[in-house]
């Protein structure tokens, strides 16, 4: 029986990707070697890295002004790395606080220099995206998080600003088209819509670097990795390889535009049931609901949770528990999630209603 995996991350990936990756663990590129034991300097892996970078550029229409990197350390390392590269000693970084990850990014910058929060939805447990805030055009940068997995909110329109725009797109990159030219830095951990944990995708505007005027540790300097083609040190070979396979799959299935249509269809199916069914309630403001992560509660948990959880288990639905900090339920619907899996969850919700 199929398991419907709604885990927030590490995420579901296409079965075709799993199949090819598993074969390459035994014999990669007909070398008689595993992909995880080949040299990262070999022609075979250099070709993988080159194709992965080319596919990122193709799918997101990355302009020539920007570089594409595959780094390590996760998005969490980017919190400090971006501050080292963009925050000057006498300048300031501005942050939109929409959840746990943006808050952590702000704290890293505040430990290095002048950082300030321009708006926050913490007062309402991060259940909406703030609007109508002012950004200082003279700030060193403005940072936002496009999608919030814990609270189920998503930025639908990015702010217009003269300040360099930086965004953590870890949980919704490649789920919709993005105008990369408007951003000085985009970063994303691979383990949502791209591949297994271990690689971090970075898209950085070359002309934005070298201006902070501070000492930058070698490994935290974007220019270090640009100059070496993401191979200053040994890259996360397997994660980059699987990410490349996922990007191939994405392109073969209509690209980012087609992914957006599928994601909106899946999200609409689930949110319509949440709104229709009197036993459930959504937690995020309707206008800010994420297409990637739908968060919801039972109206009467004491009366219905045990039954609903048993029904979910019987249907082989996995990973729908809400984040430990908020509870409830969370259905993560990344690119590789089939509509049939969302329909299976919706059927459970309808069955619960019929029981009571």
Q: Each predicted region: which residue ranges?
A:
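Conserved PLP-anchoring active-site segment centered on the Schiff-base-forming lysine
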Residues: 88-101
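Active-site C-terminal subdomain of aminotransferase-like
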Residues: 190-271, 285, 355-356
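A glycine-/small-polar-enriched, mobile loop at the entrance of the PLP active site in fold-type I
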Residues: 2-53
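Conserved PLP-binding catalytic core of the aspartate aminotransferase-like
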Residues: 280-311
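Conserved active-site segment immediately N-terminal to the catalytic lysine
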Residues: 166, 180-191
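Conserved N-terminal alpha-helix of the aminotransferase class I/II PLP-enzyme fold
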Residues: 32-78, 85, 99-100, 108
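Active-site phosphate-binding strand-loop segment of PLP-dependent enzymes
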Residues: 9, 109, 120-173
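PLP-dependent enzyme catalytic core of the Aspartate aminotransferase-like
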Residues: 3, 327-356
């Amino acid at each position: 029986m199929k398991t419907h995996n709604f885990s927030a991350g590490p995420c579901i990936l296409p079965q075709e990707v799993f199949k090819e990756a598993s074969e390459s663990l035994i014999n990669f590129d007909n070398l008689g070697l595993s992909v995880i034991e080949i040299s990262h300097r070999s022609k075979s892996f250099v070709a993988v890295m080159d194709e992965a970078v080319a596919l990122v550029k193709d799918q997101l229409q990355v302009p020539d002004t920007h570089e594409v990197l595959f780094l390590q350390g996760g998005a969490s390392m980017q919190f400090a790395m971006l501050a080292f590269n963009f925050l000057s000693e006498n300048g300031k970084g501005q942050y939109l606080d929409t959840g746990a990850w943006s808050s952590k990014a702000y704290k890293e910058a505040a430990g290095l220099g002048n950082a300030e929060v321009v708006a926050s939805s913490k007062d309402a447990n991060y259940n909406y995206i703030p609007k109508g805030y002012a950004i200082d055009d003279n700030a060193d940068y403005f940072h936002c998080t496009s999608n919030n997995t814990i609270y189920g909110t998503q930025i639908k329109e990015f702010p217009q600003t003269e300040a360099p725009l930086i965004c953590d797109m870890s949980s919704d990159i490649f789920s919709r088209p993005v105008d990369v030219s408007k951003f000085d830095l985009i970063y994303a951990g691979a383990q949502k819509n791209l591949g297994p944990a271990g690689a971090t995708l970075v898209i950085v505007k070359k002309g934005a670097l070298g201006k902070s005027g501070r000492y930058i540790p070698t490994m935290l300097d974007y220019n270090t990795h640009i100059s070496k083609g993401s191979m200053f040190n040994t890259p996360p070979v397997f994660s980059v390889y699987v990410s490349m396979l996922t990007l191939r799959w994405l392109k073969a299935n209509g690209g980012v535009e087609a992914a957006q249509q599928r994601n909106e269809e899946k999200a609409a199916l689930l949110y319509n049931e949440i709104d229709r069914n009197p036993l459930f309630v959504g937690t995020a403001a309707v206008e800010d609901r994420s297409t990637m992560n739908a968060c919801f509660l039972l109206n009467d948990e004491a009366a219905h949770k045990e039954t609903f959880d048993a029904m979910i288990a019987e249907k082989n639905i996995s990973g729908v528990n809400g984040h430990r900090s908020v509870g409830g339920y969370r259905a993560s619907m990344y690119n590789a999630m089939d509509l049939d899996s969302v329909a299976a969850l919706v059927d459970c919700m309808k069955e619960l209603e019929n029981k009571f």
